[in-house]
Amino acid sequence: VKLVRTRSEAKSLVTTAFGKGFPNYDPTNRLKESWRKFSFSRDGFVDMAKAIARYVYPPNYVKIMGKEVGYAYFQNFIPNNESDTRIIVIDGKAFGLLRYVRKGDFRASGSGSFAYEREHFDERCVSIAFEITEKLSMQCVAFDFVFDAANQPLIVEISYGFSAPGYDPCPGYWTPDLEWHEGPFNPQGWMVDLVIKQTTNDSNLHNH
């Protein structure tokens, strides 16, 4: 993800996208990001050491992954957001976190700075997430929201997966009626239950 400020920058990115492409793994960027986290918290020493090692010896999967080539996506930049809102929906249940923007950057992804308490969330995001999940018949999906100048929620990204440990501190979840259910939960278990339920339904249809 890059912030494009000029027409010439956009043309350069398009030329690369439809030319040699972009590597899936950028060791220089990984090293910079690991240093940023290490500077923020000394707990990142192991990650920093791994980044240095991978800068010198790129992991084997880099060759397998290849490059991102043949496409380029652009969207309007929405300024003045100190965080984004990540809402995950699985089988009629939603949970989320706020990801604060990195210092000196515009991106929230990878910042490592989160908020989980219910009062931090605009429940319009939750409602929109449920609505779209139902319309598109999605099983597990993550939505990233920001807010425009009129304080209207906008979806900037949709993902099919998420890093599970980052959501362990979530204090509860919503159901489609926006009722809040306080307490620990197991989203991975929800996925298993959903697959079993859908497989059973498909089996029953075939039997009839």
Where are these regions (language model features)?
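Phosphate-binding core of ATP-grasp and ATP-grasp-like enzymes
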Residues: A17-Y25, E68-S111, S127-V141, F147-P153, ...
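Short hydrophobic/aromatic-rich motifs at helix boundaries and adjacent loops
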Residues: D43-V46, V56-Y57, R99-K103, F114-A115
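Short flexible/disordered coil segments
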Residues: T28-R30, R54-M65, L136-A142, V156-S163, ...
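Short, glycine/charged-enriched secondary-structure capping and boundary segments
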Residues: V4-R5, V89, P171
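Short acidic/polar alpha-helix capping motifs at helix-coil junctions
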Residues: K37-F38, V46-K50, A94-F95, F106-G110, ...
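Solvent-exposed, charged interface segments at domain starts and junctions
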Residues: V1-L3, P59-T85, D202-H208
